[in-house]
Regions:
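Elongated, mostly alpha-helical coiled-coil "stalk/stator" tethers of large membrane protein machines
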Residues: 1-244, 248-250, 254, 259-275
Length: 275
């Protein structure tokens, strides 16, 4: 789980996810999946090269020098979007160089989750990952096979076990079994499930309103929020008589507030602050 991140890395994770939001906004499923693949590649590079990790997380190193280093190292191997994200991450502060690896990996998982969401398959992917986690953790033979160094054999095994699963599921599990990063099977699956859930929560809007919406109103709201996010969103409606008018929308970590009650409360706070 990502809850172990320290202060600097925790703040940088938040900023990194905002950058990913912008990167996948309006993207199609193929583009989001391609970004995911490139970020997984970067995570592997960072994981296997401590000198690169330190170079990108050294707070005393000039930002322009880091950007030039990243361009020289990765410019011909990944696209401009992924390159820009990695450059942004290098400008943030990290409690530990290893945290950068984990955050890049999380962004890769979330980018693939975005691809699945765009394709209408995120629910399916989450279910399949949960099922795979249960199956793999419960079989000593599978555990032994998947933690071996035989990369090709693991790829064949995963493809066979996940036959009929979503392409995103196969991709995520294949990536995971070839990059345990010192984790147990249970911990690795927990990290992947956490990242999938984090992206899912980013795409859920809680709407508080005094009276039920008509289907036409709900459709307009869905269209509006989808346009704002640049991806399909799920809307959960909560009827709250205390909302005097308009609508209050909690989306991700942001409030989009059009309710009379909250506008009045906001005005009252502003008046109180001006005294």
């Amino acid at each position: 789980m990502r809850a172990h991140f320290g202060g600097s890395s925790r703040k940088s994770l938040v900023a990194s996810r905002v950058s990913l939001d912008a990167a996948v906004k309006g993207a199609d499923a193929n583009s989001a999946s391609a970004l995911s693949s490139e970020l997984f590649f970067v995570a592997d590079v960072l994981s296997t090269n401590i000198a690169v990790r330190r170079a990108l997380t050294d707070p005393s190193r000039d930002g322009k020098a880091k950007a030039a280093f990243i361009s020289d190292l990765l410019g011909k191997k990944i696209g401009a979007l992924a390159l820009g994200l990695v450059t942004e991450l290098s400008s943030l502060r990290w409690s530990s160089p290893k945290d950068l690896v984990l955050v890049v990996e999380q962004l890769a998982i979330e980018a693939e989750a975005s691809a699945a969401n765009i394709a209408g398959e995120l629910d399916r992917v989450e279910d399949e990952i949960f099922t795979a986690a249960t199956a793999f953790a419960g079989s000593s033979e599978l555990r032994k096979a998947l933690t071996s160094d035989a990369t090709n054999a693991k790829a064949i095994l995963v493809a066979d076990i996940l036959k009929g699963a979503s392409g995103s599921t196969v991709k995520l599990v294949s990536q995971m079994v070839n990059a345990w990063r010192g984790r147990s099977i249970e911990s690795a699956f927990a990290d992947y499930q956490w990242a999938l859930a984090a992206r899912r929560n980013r795409l859920i809007a809680l709407v508080r309103i005094a009276a039920p919406l008509s289907q036409a109103q709900l459709d307009r709201l869905t269209t509006s929020l989808t346009s704002k996010v640049g991806q399909p969103v799920r809307i959960n409606i909560e009827i709250d008589p205390s909302v005097l008018g308009g609508v209050s929308v909690k989306f991700a970590d942001e409030m989009v507030d059009g309710s009379v009650s909250n506008r009045l409360a906001g005005a009252a706070r502003a008046l109180a602050g001006s005294k």
